[in-house]
Swiss-Prot record:
Coiled coil: none annotated. GO terms for biological process: regulation of DNA-templated transcription. This is Zinc finger protein 143. The keyword Magnesium does not apply. GO terms for molecular function: DNA-binding transcription factor activity, RNA polymerase II-specific; RNA polymerase II cis-regulatory region sequence-specific DNA binding; zinc ion binding. Belongs to the GLI C2H2-type zinc-finger protein family. The gene is ZNF143.
Length: 613
């Protein structure tokens, strides 16, 4: 038998919103009342007194009083319904809808000592064992302990549905017990079971049995509670009852928790902070914090189950996207006429669309920087150039790096370790409020190499990999003071890929006709198409590998000469690809190689990535 009761005790409380009033703390839990063999005497349980209530069947229930402040416990009194409707009406006039599993015929009136009537629900039978259930604000069971017998799943379901009802009512300023949360003291709600006198802690294991199946065709997913099933069904129905009230937003969510997390994108609140030494990151949700902590611990609990793969991931969403590399599924299609590309993840799709729109909405807020990015993840990773932090460690030799991709390159070259490193966690890269509204078109991609140890390069080569996306190709010094431009018309003769040059100027992936390579102290590289057709020759002169002296470009049918002279000492490093070798590709910023490896890998697979794709 279940008895809902309020106890004015401030311990163990869970916060519920109060609809404009002060937040009210309500905790739902399941505890043990004390029974005595003769039924006449009552024992005290840790200073808590119990009032006997005789039920209709002759058995005895107990109403708990809080002896700390001398106030009696409050039990919501409701009138006995005269009809067979599907709701009960509280004393304040509020109608409470009963869940499907609540049968009014199982509701029993209890006459209290003051002559009023309380309601007790007998819909579920609870085993007579040592049992405690702690029901959280989101309606889930946090802890479960049983003696020799297991808790009936119907019991868990009924309690969770009751908790969900309390949560909904509480959001309107009324708790599930019908008590208005104005300036009253913080309250504690309990569900009291008549059972054994032994008390146990609530820090226990949940059974985890999934007894609630989705009935929609082709789904059949199982859930541990009716409440979770109901939330899941909203993914089929599209029901989003929780709407953001921020001016101009209007987004809606399937759960109250989803709305609460979203509101923080407007307020900028990030209450969940990483406790790791030297880490100052904070997050909007505890789930995002948990995912972030795995970057410190190395935990990857989500494994790919495809035979022969064996990769594991920090989040289930990343695993889901990864599995599509096995299945070939690409559910997100670009609707731009003539494009026809498809993507495995929604994030990559949205980033791709910005290639067509030219949008670069994410701007670096560091004074004097003002760099812009198509992807928030690029901005997120760009921030590392403004810090001295090197958070990524090599597990072989202990070297530290600013970027995951630089670490990956080091492990491949120094330790022959080709194990993939997870480079992006989409859940971390959500734009903060106020970003994403500006547009900057006609940007460029910069191809660079990484110089191991310093994460710095001295020369950048800017180009594009898709015609019509930029007005020029630029060979530019790192400080931006000197450059050589190649026009858009000349660009079309280059093709979509160029060859690679090592740091000492030696070409790696040049065409078979080595005549394009000049000698006599000068090094050159032919910019070729994917088929190996020569489109343009760019001559690079590196004298004693110390000074970068001259760069010239020779175009197909027209000859253009440009000269770049500097006395600064800067090693020569240029990169590109035509044979599928993974390279570093920099998105118009200081050396950050995250996007580089990703884009190079896609080039290797025969794709033609766009600006920031």
């Amino acid at each position: 038998m279940l008895l809902a009761q309020i106890n004015r005790d401030s311990q163990g409380m869970t916060e519920f919103p109060g609809g404009g009033m002060e937040a009210q703390h309500v905790t739902l839990c399941l505890t043990e009342a004390v029974t005595v063999a003769d039924g006449d005497n009552l024992e005290n349980m840790e200073g808590v007194s119990l009032q006997a209530v005789t039920l209709a069947d002759g058995s005895t229930a107990y109403i708990q009083h809080n002896s700390k402040d001398g106030s009696a416990a409050y039990v919501q009194h409701v009138p006995i319904p005269k009809t067979t409707g599907d709701s009960l009406r509280l004393e304040d006039g509020q109608a409470v809808q009963l869940e499907d599993s609540y049968d009014q015929s199982a509701l029993q009136a209890v006459q209290l000592e003051d002559g009023t009537t309380a309601y007790i629900h007998h819909a579920v039978q609870v085993p007579q064992s040592d049992t405690i259930l702690a029901i959280q604000a989101d309606g889930t069971v946090a802890g479960l302990h049983t003696g020799d017998a297991a808790i009936d799943p119907d019991t868990i379901s009924a309690l969770e549905q009751y908790a969900a009802k309390v949560s909904i009512d509480g959001s309107e300023g009324v708790t599930g017990s019908g008590i208005i949360g104005e300036n009253e003291q913080e309250k504690k709600m309990q569900i009291v079971l008549q059972g054994h006198a032994t008390r146990v802690t609530a820090k226990s294991q949940q059974s985890g049995e999934k007894a609630f199946r989705c009935g929609y065709d082709g789904c059949g997913k199982l859930y541990t509670t009716a409440h979770h099933l109901k939330v899941h069904e909203r993914s089929h129905t599209g029901d989003r009852p929780y709407q953001c009230e921020h001016a101009g937003c209007g987004k809606a969510f399937a759960t109250g928790y989803g709305l609460k997390s979203h509101v923080r994108t407007h307020t900028g609140e990030k209450p969940y902070r990483c406790s790791e030494d030297n880490c100052t990151k904070s997050f909007k949700t505890s789930g995002d914090l948990q995912k972030h902590i795995r970057t410190h611990t190395g935990e990857r609990p989500f494994k790919c189950h495809f035979e022969g793969c064996g990769r594991s991931f920090t989040t289930s969403n990343i695993r889901k996207v990864h599995i599509r590399t096995h299945t070939g599924e690409r559910p997100y299609y670009c609707t731009e006429p003539g494009c026809g590309r498809a993507f495995a993840s929604a994030t990559n799709y949205k980033n791709h669309v910005r290639i067509h729109t030219g949008e670069k909405p994410y701007v670096c807020t560091v004074p004097g920087c003002d760099k812009r990015f198509t992807e928030y993840s690029s901005l997120y990773k760009h921030h590392v150039v403004h810090t001295h932090s090197k958070p990524y460690n090599c597990n072989h030799c202990g070297k530290t790096y600013k970027q995951i991709s630089t670490l990956a390159m080091h492990k491949r070259t120094a330790h022959n370790d080709t194990e993939p490193i997870e480079e992006e966690q989409e859940a971390f890269f959500e734009p903060p409020p106020g970003q994403g509204e500006d547009v900057l078109k006609g940007s460029q991609i910069t191809y660079v190499t990484g110089v191991e140890g310093d994460d710095v390069v001295s020369t950048q080569v800017a180009t594009v990999t898709q015609s019509g996306l930029s007005q020029q190709v630029t060979l530019i010094s790192q400080d931006g003071t000197q450059h050589v431009n190649i026009s858009q018309a000349d660009m079309q003769a280059i093709g979509n890929t160029i060859t690679m040059v090592t740091q000492d100027g030696t070409p790696i992936t040049v065409p078979a006709h080595d005549a394009v390579i000049s000698s006599a102290g000068a090094h050159s590289v032919a910019m070729v198409t994917a088929e190996g057709t020569e489109g343009q020759q760019v001559a690079i002169v590196a004298q004693d590998l110390a000074a970068f002296h001259t760069a010239s470009s020779e175009m197909g049918h027209q000859q253009h000469s440009h000269h770049l002279v500097t006395t600064e000492t800067r090693p020569l490093t240029l990169v590109a690809t035509s044979n599928g070798t993974q390279i570093a590709v920099q998105l118009g910023e200081q050396p950050s190689l995250e996007e580089a490896i990703r884009i190079a890998s896609r080039i290797q697979q025969g794709e033609t990535p766009g600006l920031d794709d």
